[in-house]
Amino acid sequence: MIIDRVEVETINSFSKLELLKEVYGLISILPILTLLLGITIEVLVIVWLEREISASIQQRIGPEYAGPLGLLQAIADGTKLLFKEDILPSRGDISLFSIGPSIAVISVLLSFLVIPLGYHFVLADLSIGVFLWIAISSIAPIGLLMAGYSSNNKYSFLGGLRAAAQSISYEIPLTFCVLAISLLSNSLSTVDIVEAQSKYGFFGWNIWRQPIGFLVFLISSLAECERLPFDLPEAEEELVAGYQTEYSGIKYGLFYLVSYLNLLVSSLFVTVLYLGGWNFSIPYISFFDFFQMNKAVGILEMTMGIFITLTKAYLFLFISITIRWTLPRMRMDQLLNLGWKFLLPISLGNLLLTTSFQLVSL
């Protein structure tokens, strides 16, 4: 059968179209891969920083043998967990046991979609950005509860119940604080919230307009991260390791990863909501406005924004690590009383006060 020239050109055009689709697909996932690489590096840095700061507080020597200054210690630990045997409980629910860590990790990773790390550097600038984060972060305790229930272990089950109770108790004050910030910024978009703080530089940050909300958000974030003094779901002296008791290998490593990812997400949201995000501390005259805008200047401005955002986030990280080695663990009744009887009324009063001021200013 003879194929004429028109049919050959048509076939070639379709093949080129398929090639373009493949190239476009690769380009579209490039930002996601870049973000995942950045998150991985950040987690490794946070683990190293925590060990070094903890060693300094306790006046001892931190990791020093795995690489220069112990920088490769986290990679060595992750590699060890990757190759350890994955032990499954004989009388547990194997499917839920395997799904639990995955739900926890995925829910935390999705939170990075709406975090603006720099100017024009956000995966999804949604109109409901902060509410999407709250909705996604409330899924993680379901994974922890599934992990505790499926282990068929009383310590694991108690740890899962504690994680769920703790998350519910502190999610509500956290939401009220976010609502107050949204009222001040007239938007739920994380990018709009940052830009609303850029007008007056350092004095335009929401931490000065919402000092009570900032303290409540700070405490609630630490509780959501299950850090000392709020690490009751995995209290070693009481519950062995809580919902992680029956886990080993890569599944245990996923829970370890979730802990530091939660800490990183909370640090970035404190920066975005209260510390001006990528904005510099001087009043709003951008250094880059003196130059003609081109690609090089745009990339440099974005890089500076990322650097400023991460610098502010590391301040929260330092505070959380210091608190870990300063305050003792709370009892479960004290933790619930703090959430329901103290933080909830204060955050609700702060929201009502903010609403009143916004109505008066109209």
From Swiss-Prot:
Q: Can you provide one Gene Ontology molecular function annotated for this UniProt record?
A: oxidoreductase activity, acting on NAD(P)H, quinone or similar compound as acceptor
Q: Which UniProt keywords apply?
A: Chloroplast, Membrane, NAD, NADP, Plastid, Plastoquinone, Quinone, Thylakoid, Translocase, Transmembrane, Transmembrane helix
Q: Which reaction does it catalyse?
A: a plastoquinone + NADH + (n+1) H(+)(in) = a plastoquinol + NAD(+) + n H(+)(out); a plastoquinone + NADPH + (n+1) H(+)(in) = a plastoquinol + NADP(+) + n H(+)(out)
Under Enzyme Commission nomenclature, its number is 7.1.1.-
Q: Locate the transmembrane regions by residue number.
A: 29-49, 103-123, 128-148, 164-184, 202-222, 247-267, 303-323, 342-362
The organism sits in which domain of life? Eukaryota
An annotated GO cellular component of this protein is: chloroplast thylakoid membrane
Looking up InterPro entries in the UniProt record yields:
NADH_UbQ_OxRdtase_su1/FPO, NADH_UbQ_OxRdtase_su1_CS
**Where does the protein principally reside?**
plastid
Q: Where in the cell is it found?
A: Plastid, Chloroplast thylakoid membrane
Q: Which terms does the UniProt entry file under GO BP?
A: aerobic respiration; photosynthesis, light reaction
Q: How does it sit in the membrane?
A: Multi-pass membrane protein
User: Which family is this sequence assigned to?
Assistant: Belongs to the complex I subunit 1 family.
Assembly notes: NDH is composed of at least 16 different subunits, 5 of which are encoded in the nucleus.
> What does the record give as the function of this protein?
NDH shuttles electrons from NAD(P)H:plastoquinone, via FMN and iron-sulfur (Fe-S) centers, to quinones in the photosynthetic chain and possibly in a chloroplast respiratory chain. The immediate electron acceptor for the enzyme in this species is believed to be plastoquinone. Couples the redox reaction to proton translocation, and thus conserves the redox energy in a proton gradient.
Provide the protein name: NAD(P)H-quinone oxidoreductase subunit 1, chloroplastic
Species of provenance = Hordeum vulgare (Barley)
